């Protein structure tokens, strides 16, 4: 049709990005919008007044596109949701297990039965929306602004001399490019191997991971990172180790926020590129968090999750949990925390929080 008011809106985007809350009547009232700008007076009346989960059909494939793609016009089109939320389903999320999609940044998701969340409002996260991940459960989202990007930043920093090879009179341009690419491609792997051999001590180099601000807990994108405990003996592997630990401390701050707000975290589920590619980082994550992290088999959890929702919307499964059980690929690796290292990391995490508080206080 051509009536925008008939378009079915997904609760995932509406709840996490448009302030939709059914228990408060849906979208914010008109007074809210007009208080932001008089031009927004009446804006609310042009928006939607209902939402749907990703397990429900939005309608059927338009005849034009059906003919163009050689498909049936009876193909059901499902309601949309955010990539990582579908990825959490593709990664077989379970109640009270923190599902972490780890790539350039992280998206951390947790689900809990709606009946167990009554009266609980989690401060400082990125949204708490009924049905945004699994229908019938409360979907909660958090995340880090930089995760893989933090490691990429460090690689770029160390690679600066390599960028100057093109000006060398000793090698030709093609050799310079090949050499630069080879070293750059191996750098994170080599740094990880060396960092894994380093002893762990309370006085080691310490990094705050806010290289792209802080998303959770308590979003503040203007905050910046910091490094302490540097000395003349600090080498590239030691500093890389600090950056990795900093990102894992940032991850622990998210888990602790849920726990402090009365939401248990029973374990971790690792998804995404970093989870699949870096055993060193995942072991540090397990040690810092002091809980196991299961790595899902599939490298395309978002696509698998979308397929699970599509199968549910099409009626192949009664509920998305059934699709998860039938279509899920399971886990291929479990990283278990080392008790001795976890005890040291508990002390270093306290130092991380102290340094972070100082940095944030200095900014304020």
Where are these regions (language model features)?
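Short beta-strand-to-turn element immediately C-terminal to the catalytic PLP-Schiff-base lysine
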Residues: 1, 91-92, 108-112
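Gly/Ser/Thr-rich active-site cleft segment
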Residues: 1-81, 208-212, 240, 244
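Glycine/Thr-rich phosphate-binding loops that ligate phosphate moieties of nucleotide
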Residues: 18, 25-26, 52-60, 78-79, ...
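Generic recognition of flexible, low-complexity loop/linker segments
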Residues: 65, 74-77, 87-89, 95-97, ...
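Short helix-loop-beta connector
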Residues: 72, 94-95, 263-266
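Short glycine-aspartate micro-motif
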Residues: 74-81, 90, 97-101, 107, ...
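Flexible, glycine/threonine-enriched loop-and-boundary segments that flank and lead into catalytic domains
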Residues: 82-88, 264
């Amino acid at each position: 049709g051509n009536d925008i008011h008939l378009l079915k809106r997904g609760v995932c985007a509406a709840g996490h990005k448009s302030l939709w809350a059914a228990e408060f009547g849906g979208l914010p009232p008109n007074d809210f919008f007009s208080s932001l700008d008089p031009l927004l007076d009446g804006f609310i009346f042009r928006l939607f007044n209902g939402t749907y989960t990703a397990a429900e059909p939005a309608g059927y494939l338009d005849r034009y596109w059906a003919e163009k793609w050689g498909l049936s016009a009876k193909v059901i089109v499902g309601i949309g949701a955010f990539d990582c939320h579908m990825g959490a389903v593709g990664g077989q999320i379970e109640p009270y297990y923190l599902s972490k999609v780890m790539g350039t940044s992280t998206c951390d998701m947790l689900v809990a039965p709606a009946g167990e969340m009554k009266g609980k409002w989690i401060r400082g996260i990125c949204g708490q929306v009924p049905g945004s991940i699994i229908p019938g459960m409360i979907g909660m989202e958090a995340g880090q602004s930089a995760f893989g990007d933090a490691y990429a930043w460090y690689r770029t920093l160390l690679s600066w001399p390599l960028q100057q090879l093109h000006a060398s009179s000793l090698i030709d341009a093609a050799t310079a490019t090949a050499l630069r690419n080879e070293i750059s491609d191996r750098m994170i792997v080599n740094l990880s191997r060396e960092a894994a051999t380093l002893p762990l001590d309370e006085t080691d180099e310490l990094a705050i991971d806010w290289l792209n601000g802080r998303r959770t807990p308590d979003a503040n994108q203007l905050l910046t990172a910091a490094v302490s405990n540097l000395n003349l003996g600090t080498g590239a592997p030691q500093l890389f180790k600090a950056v990795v630990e900093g990102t894992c401390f940032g991850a622990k701050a998210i888990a602790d926020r849920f726990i402090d707000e009365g939401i248990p975290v029973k374990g971790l589920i690792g998804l995404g590129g970093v989870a699949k590619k870096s055993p060193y980082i995942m072991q540090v994550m397990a040690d810092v968090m002091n809980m196991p992290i299961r790595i899902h088999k599939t490298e395309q959890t978002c696509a698998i999750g979308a397929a699970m929702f599509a199968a549910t919307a099409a009626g192949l499964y009664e509920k998305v949990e059934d699709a998860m059980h039938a279509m899920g690929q399971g886990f291929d690796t479990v990283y278990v925390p080392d008790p001795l290292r976890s005890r040291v990391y508990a002390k270093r995490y306290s130092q991380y929080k102290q340094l972070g508080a100082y940095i944030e206080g200095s900014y304020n």
